């Protein structure tokens, strides 16, 4: 349930950012918020899928039928691990939010 709710919240946040850009605005710290939210949501969704699939999650699909049934959750899970690191670590993104949104001093 949380993964679904997070995905819906992320979609709304993305729509808000796109709307702001379409109306001539610029984006700021909300890009950092979106990045953090997305990378943590991606981890949650893939961890949940791995838990639900159990040992089957570790088996790469060998046929089209297996791929249709299981997808490639293992690949997605492995890729999701890098989300909090690439495109600026989540720690850096949190510092940007602290400085630009909360007005805190630089670290």
Regions found by a protein language model. Name each.
Residues 1-107:
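Alpha-helical interface subdomain recognition
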